Structure formats: structure tokens, C-alpha cells
């Protein structure tokens, strides 16, 4: 469910009213939410927010890049998003000579707007509930493998059918609520996106890691881009002949401000939620996954930070990588503190005890409710050691040591079939790679993995110990 689904959260922010903290699927606004929204002060109809027959707010709220939310704010494709969302593209366009990260950038004309290769903006053209198509022929007794086989076949078949009916679009069928509901998204993807303006990092990332994930924020966290299209206003690869996208709908920004009690809502692309975790999963998060992530990323970030401070070139090369790593490093720190402070695990245990009491009183053993929680607990506890080692392999090696990345990016078949594309991709990767920095990181990761993992990868015993007498630095 990662960041690809248009949902809406609405809240009345009056001090005398309680916020309705929900995530609501747009196709169900008319049926489920709009009456309550209007009672709280919303002046829009459900069709003003989501419609497949006319332009609506869904046409102004877009997926920016890998999954951020952006909003179209002019009839000529001007787009606002967060600074941290545009950060990767801003970094990619920066150099020591043109240091947009440090100094910011503002195009004084459309001719000065800078193309951002690889950046995409996706417009959701329709959302439909396809649960019956995906789950209709899945037996209620299906095991996990059978369930995955049947649903995968159904998704492939439905995707192909919808793709044929929507030429020029991208179709994605995604599960919600752990596979209990499925939605199909028809998406139009624009690939000519240009940087219009960004504040310097001193504003866009003001407060750095200290300010991140905190409230209230003090950061000027914004950047400005523009979507370009072909002469027919459809998606087109970059060309000087392209023109600004003519928006079907754009957000009109009021300069009148707001007052207490005004209706407010958020529309966009949130990530997946963890609020349905059991107490056993929360315990694993507190004692395994979060501490591992905080420690391993903290060790790597210290090395990156030192090298970035010593060289403008390295600072630019690693700015986006550092920001990506530190984002969920800080998130893990805050999440653990919040769970402990708010007693989340204890509240979950109370809910589970109430559920267990209800199940034992009101259901039969063969219905599966009575032993549901014990089975979940057994599975989570059985995976604890495996997850610990898996996370070290992922965080300390696959994420941290960059020289391993090309092996994941390419294989012989790709390079033979698409040699020019492979060369371009490799050149782009090397542009932001500094071998001395990566070597320092690799040395540290090899050491901490040996210190913390009880079951090490075989190369430790077969190569590091035999050929280098256990010296990970020499290896």
C-alpha cells in the first residue's frame, strides 16, 4: 500500500470539535463521508473532490516522484511539493559549480526551468473497487500459497483487460487491508518535469534531523516544479518543443487566511499504516527492528557526515542518500519513544484480552477466532531471530555498502539486450559514488555485523578468516 493510493483525511479543526482522523477512499465519499464532511463545514460536493466524468480535485493532487504528494496550482502545470520530496532531483541537478542544494534556485523565466531526468508525475484518472474480480474465485479454505497464486492470476488478467481499455495509461491493482479489498488505479504518467524553484538547504532542511518528524515544524519544506506535455497535452519525453501541461483542475490558493473552526482536510498519498499491529509485533519493533535500524544507520551516517563536511563534491553526492537514511532513522527513534510514552503496547494487550474473551464466549474453535492470537504470537516469536539477522543483512550490507548496488541493478541479460541504457544507468550511479567513503562504510559494517550477528554469512569464515586472519579491514 506504499504511497500510491489516493485517500482523504478530513478534520474539523475547531477547538470545540473532535477531528475525524480517518483515511477514506475517494470513490466512497458520496456513500460514506460527504454528509458528515458537509456538517463540519465542507462546501464541496463529493463530485467536486472525486469524479471520473468531470475535472475534480483528484486531477490536481498528484503522485510526485516515487510516492510523494504534489499539487497543481496553476493552469500551466505549476506544481508544489515538499523540499524533501524534490530533494533527490535537486541533488541530481546540483554540482560544485551549480550548487542548488546550498544556494537554492529560482527560474526567472520558463526558459530557465531545468529538466529533471527520471522524475515522473502521475495523475490518477480513476479508482475502482475490484475486490470481487480478485477474490471472487478464491476458496474460503485457501492456504497462503493458493491464495497468492489465484489472486496473482486474477490481478494479471484484470490488469491486462484494463490496460487494453485504457491505452496510454498505466494500470495498477493494489491490495488494501491485508488483501481483504482490492482497488484498480488508472494512471497517466508525465515524464517531462522541470525544476522551477527551491530554497537553499538552510531553509528547506532547517533544523536538520533535530526538526524532522517533530511538531510543530520550523522548516521551509517546499519546492516548485512544472509538468510539461506534448502538443496534444498528453505525456511526452523531454523535448524543447513541449509546452506546460494544461491542467484540467488546479488548486486556487486563497490569500484571505483562515479562522478558528474552518473546515480542513488533507488529500494525498500516505504510506502504509502500522496501527493494526499486535502487541507481539510492537514488542518486536521496540526490541529488534527499531534498535537495529537506529544503530546501523547511525554508524553509517556518522561516516557520511564526516566526509560530506570535508568535501563539497562528496556533500552533493551523498546529500540525498544521507537524507533518505536519516529520515527513517529519526522516525524509528521517535516511534519507539512515542510507543513507550503512550503505553501503546499495553493498550494493545488490553484490546487483545478483550478480543480473546469475546472469541472464547461467542465462537466455536473450528471458526478460527479462539486460536488466532496465539498463532500470531507463535509466528512472530518464531521469526524474531530470523528478522534480527535479516535486518542486519539488509541494513548493514544491501543498503549501506554501495558497491553492491550495481550487482542488484544489472545482470548480463539486461546489459546485452539494452547496452546503451545499461551504460547510462551505470554512469548515473557512478556520478554520486565516492569509493573512499564507501570503503569506510564497508569496514564499519563488516565489524558491527561480526559483533552482533550470531549466524554470519559464509564469506566471513571462508574468506575473511581463512585469507585475512579475521581482519575485516584488510578484507
Locations of the language-model features?
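Terminal presequence/propeptide segments associated with secretion/organelle targeting
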Residues: 2, 8, 15-475
Amino acid at each position: 500500500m506504499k504511497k500510491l493510493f489516493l485517500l482523504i483525511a478530513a478534520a474539523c479543526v475547531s477547538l470545540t470539535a473532535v477531528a475525524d482522523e480517518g483515511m477514506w477512499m475517494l470513490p466512497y465519499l458520496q456513500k460514506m463521508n460527504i454528509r458528515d464532511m458537509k456538517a463540519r463545514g465542507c462546501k464541496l460536493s463529493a463530485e467536486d473532490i472525486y469524479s471520473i466524468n468531470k475535472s475534480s480535485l483528484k486531477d490536481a493532487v498528484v503522485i510526485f516522484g516515487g510516492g510523494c504528494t504534489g499539487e497543481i496550482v496553476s493552469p500551466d502545470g505549476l506544481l508544489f511539493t515538499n523540499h524533501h520530496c524534490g530533494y533527490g532531483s535537486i541533488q541530481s541537478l546540483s554540482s560544485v559549480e551549480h550548487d542548488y542544494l546550498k544556494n537554492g534556485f529560482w527560474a526567472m523565466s520558463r526558459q530557465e526551468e531545468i529538466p529533471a531526468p527520471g522524475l515522473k508525475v502521475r495523475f490518477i484518472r480513476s479508482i475502482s473497487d475490484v475486490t470481487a474480480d480478485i477474490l471472487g474465485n478464491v476458496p474460503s479454505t485457501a492456504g497462503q500459497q493458493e491464495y497468492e497464486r489465484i489472486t496473482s492470476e486474477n490481478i494479471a488478467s484484470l490488469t491486462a483487460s484494463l490496460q487494453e481499455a485504457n491505452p496510454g495509461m498505466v494500470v495498477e491493482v493494489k491490495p488494501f487491508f491485508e488483501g481483504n479489498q482490492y482497488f484498480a488505479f488508472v494512471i497517466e504518467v508525465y515524464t517531462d518535469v522541470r525544476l522551477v524553484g527551491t530554497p537553499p538547504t538552510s531553509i528547506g532542511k532547517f533544523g536538520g534531523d533535530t526538526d524532522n518528524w517533530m511538531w510543530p515544524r520550523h522548516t521551509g519544506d517546499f519546492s516548485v516544479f512544472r509538468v510539461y506535455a506534448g502538443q496534444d497535452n498528453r505525456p511526452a519525453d523531454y523535448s524543447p518543443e513541449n509546452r506546460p501541461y494544461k491542467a484540467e483542475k488546479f488548486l486556487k490558493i486563497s490569500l484571505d487566511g483562515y479562522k478558528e473552526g474552518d473546515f480542513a482536510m488533507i488529500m494525498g498519498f500516505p504510506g502504509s499504516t502500522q496501527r493494526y499491529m499486535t502487541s507481539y509485533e510492537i514488542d518486536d519493533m521496540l526490541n529488534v527492528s527499531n534498535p537495529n535500524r537506529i544503530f546501523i544507520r547511525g554508524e553509517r551516517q556518522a561516516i557520511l557526515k564526516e566526509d560530506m563536511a570535508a568535501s563539497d563534491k562528496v556533500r552533493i553526492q551523498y546529500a540525498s542518500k544521507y537524507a533518505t537514511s536519516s529520515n527513517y532513522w529519526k522516525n524509528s527513534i521517535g516511534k519507539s519513544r512515542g510507543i513507550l510514552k503512550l503505553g501503546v503496547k499495553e493498550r494493545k494487550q488490553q484490546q487483545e484480552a478483550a478480543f480473546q474473551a469475546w472469541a472464547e464466549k461467542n465462537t466455536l474453535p473450528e471458526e478460527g477466532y479462539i486460536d488466532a492470537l496465539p498463532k500470531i504470537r507463535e509466528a512472530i516469536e518464531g521469526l524474531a531471530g530470523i528478522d534480527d539477522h535479516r535486518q542486519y543483512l539488509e541494513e548493514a550490507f544491501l543498503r549501506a555498502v554501495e558497491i553492491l548496488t550495481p550487482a542488484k541493478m544489472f545482470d548480463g541479460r539486461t546489459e546485452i539486450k539494452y547496452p546503451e541504457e545499461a551504460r547510462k544507468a551505470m554512469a548515473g550511479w557512478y556520478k554520486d559514488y565516492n569509493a573512499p567513503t564507501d570503503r569506510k562504510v564497508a569496514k564499519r559494517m563488516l565489524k558491527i555485523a561480526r559483533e552482533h550477528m550470531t549466524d554470519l554469512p559464509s564469506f566471513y569464515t571462508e574468506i575473511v578468516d581463512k585469507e585475512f586472519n579475521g581482519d575485516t579491514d584488510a578484507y
